[in-house]
Amino acid sequence: MTSKYAIILAAGQGTRMKSKLYKVLHPVCGKPMVDHVLTEIEKNNMDEIVTVVGHGAEMVEKTLGDRTKYALQAEQLGTGHAVLQAEKLLGDKDGMTLIACGDTPLFTAKTFEELFEYHKSKGAVATVLTAHAENPFGYGRIIRNEIGIVEKIVEQKDATVEEATVKEINTGVYCFDNKELFAALHQIKNDNAQGEYYLPDVMEIFQKQGKVVAAYQMKNFEESMGVNDRIALSNATKVMRRRINENLMRQGVTLIDPDTTYIDIDVKVGSDTVIEPGVQLKGKTEIGADCYIGAHSEIIDSVIEDGVKVTSSYIEDAVMHKNSNIGPYSHLRPKAEIGENAHIGNFVEVKKATIGKNTKVGHLTYVGDATLGRDINVGCGTVFVNYDGINKHHTTVGDYSFIGSASNIIAPVNIADHAYVAAGSTITDDIDAHDMGIARGRQVNKKGYFDRYPVAEAARIAEEKAKEE
């Protein structure tokens, strides 16, 4: 079986991005561009992958880790020079080598597989992946002879007027006989408009040597979209987003408006889940089956189990167990865990807290650094006061307890099972099982005090107007 290798070119500075972030690390649907390329290449069961890095090498290595080896291109002298930097790692190996660019995130594993198969079937030393472009400006042109054989690849800046009219373009992806590739790379020259060593020049070298050079024209030009600036990044993101959304819909997920639904590449969604417009699902989020994700919700790196309803809320690094619900306008912060069939209502914030099964936190409440048991009712306006200005403190509320509205729970306290907190209390001590905690001043009614305040005059005027109606 023929060995398969790959070289990913990721050394370009990407000055047109006008960014501090290394170009190939700009994300497309939640994953850096170069990671998209590596992931699709990996699906072809490669024997070894080398990524050529330059500016920002450490950041690329941190992102991709040990999934690939690395070669450094210290000076940017062209694509041919970049590939040559991998010679120490691959130069003596027999087999086929795929070359792809780290700023082309839309290529699929299937396209790479088809290129490998076509290359083998033609017995070629080099095969370039081409595409038909209605507007080929900026791309290298595939120049064929009268019988259709590839003679050379000409870059835009070096093309004659006639060559510039050719619409078959170089996608920047190749398959080579590995040893033949590195032998030819030592023969290319930099006598061109850019003064660089172009990888495509090896094609002409092979032709002059009488070796087989092939071209495989892919069906979908869209895959070949490279990213050199923010506009191209936006266009690539649109294509990837459409691809993700259509795949989910084929798997039984309902997207009310796919054009306004933003789902990252690693997100998983179960069947019969309904996603409304304006939703953003990011990172490693997992959504179960039969869920409802309401308009303008944003969910990041969270687990949403089957049957959960999320209404216009923000959830990050949290877990919602099956048949629970949240919203509208609530916020689950990191390490929030919402139990089965629990209810988190509107304008509620939960941070680093566990909410038990069937527990209800209806509205206008903050729950931080707390463990709440099952079947608890937390009244409106309750605040779990967890921070003393230096340290965070934990509160525990036992099963079947009741927290009255407008209560302040000053951590650290333990409220036992079957305990009751009277509305309006500020709780600073533990409450035992079956006890009620009440901490508020007694009501005192001041006779005639209403008439002492300015509101009394306003009320008198309103009352007179009401009589005239």
Curated annotation (Swiss-Prot):
Cofactor needs:
Mg(2+)
**Pathway(s) served:** Nucleotide-sugar biosynthesis; UDP-N-acetyl-alpha-D-glucosamine biosynthesis; N-acetyl-alpha-D-glucosamine 1-phosphate from alpha-D-glucosamine 6-phosphate (route II): step 2/2; Nucleotide-sugar biosynthesis; UDP-N-acetyl-alpha-D-glucosamine biosynthesis; UDP-N-acetyl-alpha-D-glucosamine from N-acetyl-alpha-D-glucosamine 1-phosphate: step 1/1; Bacterial outer membrane biogenesis; LPS lipid A biosynthesis
Look up the signal peptide feature and give its range. Answer: none
Annotated GO molecular function terms are: glucosamine-1-phosphate N-acetyltransferase activity; magnesium ion binding; UDP-N-acetylglucosamine diphosphorylase activity
**Pfam family membership, one:** Hexapep
A GO CC term? membrane
Which residues lie within the region annotated Pyrophosphorylase? 1-230
Q: Where is the active site?
A: H363 (proton acceptor)
Q: What class of enzyme is it?
A: transferase
Q: What does this protein do?
A: Catalyzes the last two sequential reactions in the de novo biosynthetic pathway for UDP-N-acetylglucosamine (UDP-GlcNAc). The C-terminal domain catalyzes the transfer of acetyl group from acetyl coenzyme A to glucosamine-1-phosphate (GlcN-1-P) to produce N-acetylglucosamine-1-phosphate (GlcNAc-1-P), which is converted into UDP-GlcNAc by the transfer of uridine 5-monophosphate (from uridine 5-triphosphate), a reaction catalyzed by the N-terminal domain.
Q: Which family does it belong to?
A: In the N-terminal section; belongs to the N-acetylglucosamine-1-phosphate uridyltransferase family. In the C-terminal section; belongs to the transferase hexapeptide repeat family.
Fill in the subunit field for this protein: Homotrimer.
Please report the name of this protein according to its UniProt entry.
Bifunctional protein GlmU
- The source organism is Ligilactobacillus salivarius (strain UCC118)
